[in-house]
Amino acid sequence: MLRYLINRGCKKYVLASSIAAVGFQDRKFRPVNLPIADDHPCLDRSGYGISKYFMEEISKYCYRQSEDIDIINLRLSSVCVDNNIPPLKDISPLTEWSLGGITIMNLTDAIRAFTMSVENPYKPGVRIMNATGPKAWTSVPVAEILRNWWGDDVDLSYFEQSGNEYDSVYDVSRIQQEIGFIALNTPEITSS
């Protein structure tokens, strides 16, 4: 599809990737660093994450062939319809997809992320951006949940700093800087 559109002159693309491109759906997953960067490598073991990673790689391949195209790959968080947002997560056992359960955005914000990406000025290149809320979907500090899941396997010091206790597990600074997107429906607003 990309090649077809490129051959017909389309210059701008916004593609739906997933925060699962890093491979978090496997219980053996441990991030390289926290918060998880936009360009975190794929450490997938189950097949789902690598399918998203391959899509991102195909977009890079297409760009190498046509360096005048603008591609934004949004690594989208778990998305819930606005009137069916789950309760905030507490400490619980690590299961498949656990990280997705604390990285939630409502549908209105997800649509806004895509809209703002489409409306963002044309900029040739390939960009990968975490499209998640700025806060984790938790009722307790993130470090407590991650320590319960991963023990001392991962450096949690970022979440132990004052003011970062409830921050998203994913770094959202690039999407904020480049397209101005910040999810509006955060746990504090939704749960009050």
Task: List the predicted regions and their residue ranges.
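Conserved SDR Rossmann-fold cofactor-binding beta-strand/turn motif
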Residues: S17-S18, N73-S78
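Hydrophobic positions on the long internal alpha-helix
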Residues: M1-L5, I58-S59, A113, S117
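Short-chain dehydrogenase/reductase
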Residues: N33-H40, D44-E56, G100-T108
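Alpha-helical substrate-binding/gating segment
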Residues: V79-T95, G100-I128
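Active-site Tyr-X1-5-Lys
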Residues: R3, L43-I71
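Conserved Rossmann-fold NAD(P)-dependent oxidoreductase catalytic core, especially the SDR/UDP-sugar
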Residues: M1-R45
